[in-house]
Amino acid sequence: MSFLKKSLFLVLFLGLVSSSICEEEKRETEEEENEDEIEEESEEKKREDPERPPGFTPFRVY
């Protein structure tokens, strides 16, 4: 009987550990995806509106 209890506790413990590892990996991939999205948004903003010195206009005024 004690052998069954020990093996049951071992199985439950290993299941808990593996599920926590899976959750960590899932969180890491979600964070990486969010970082990639933020980088893409910042690159799009740079393409749309490049930084210019104050008072500079792309048009010539005579």
From Swiss-Prot:
Claim: Signal is one of the keywords in the record: yes
GO BP: defense response
Keyword Secreted: yes
Keywords, sorted A to Z: Amphibian defense peptide, Bradykinin receptor impairing toxin, G-protein coupled receptor impairing toxin, Secreted, Signal, Sulfation, Toxin
Annotated tissue distribution: Expressed by the skin glands.
Compositionally skewed regions (Basic and acidic residues) per UniProt: 43-52
Molecular-function GO terms, alphabetical: toxin activity
Places the protein is found: Secreted
Signal peptide as annotated in the record: 1-19
Main location: secreted
Chain positions covered by the region annotation Disordered: 22-62
Source taxon at top rank: Eukaryota
InterPro entries (alphabetical): Frog_antimicrobial_propeptide
One GO cellular component term noted in the UniProt record for this chain: extracellular region
Modified residues annotated as Sulfotyrosine in this record: 62
PTM characteristics: Asp,Pro,Glu-[Thr6,Val10]-phyllokinin and [Thr6,Val10]-phyllokinin occur in sulfated and nonsulfated forms. [Thr6]-bradykinin and Des-Arg-[Thr6]-bradykinin are nonsulfated.
Composition bias, Acidic residues: 30-42
Pro-peptide region(s): 20-48
Family, per entry: Belongs to the frog skin active peptide (FSAP) family. Bradykinin-related peptide subfamily.
Protein name per UniProt: Phyllokinin-1
Organism whose genome encodes this protein: Pithecopus azureus
Gene name of the encoded protein: pp-H1
